[in-house]
Amino acid sequence: MQFSELVDAVRKNPLDVTITEDWGQGRASFGGLMVALQYEAMRAQVSSERALRSLAVTFVGPAEPGVPVSFEVEVLREGKAVSQVLGRAVQNGQVVTLVQGSFGGARESAVKVDSLPAPDMKAPEQCPLLPYIKGVTPEFMR
């Protein structure tokens, strides 16, 4: 299953997503994947005008590939400038990943820091593929 298909699954129904076994390492799904999918569920609950400002992650237990996961979201506080959001990835009734995020809008400041522009990047379909090497690269690279 492609990463984009998993993201689409979270967008369609975050409470019932099954991560395929090719996204696993041993008995657990890759942690970065769990965070990306939980973030996607959280992002959907916050105004697009509020950018992600911080993200704290706790891996509570392994998320077993092939078993449905529920990416739950609770907006803890929707303030004037910042939204505090808690995400829980739950599997078999147990929390496997906790993610707390702060999303905030732009605001006036006496501090001015010029940011560098984002680099130009090709679309994923235009990038060279990393070859699959059995025992070296993860199964999802196939």
Task: List PLM regions with ranges.
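Terminal targeting signals and extreme-terminal segments of soluble enzymes
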Residues: 1-142
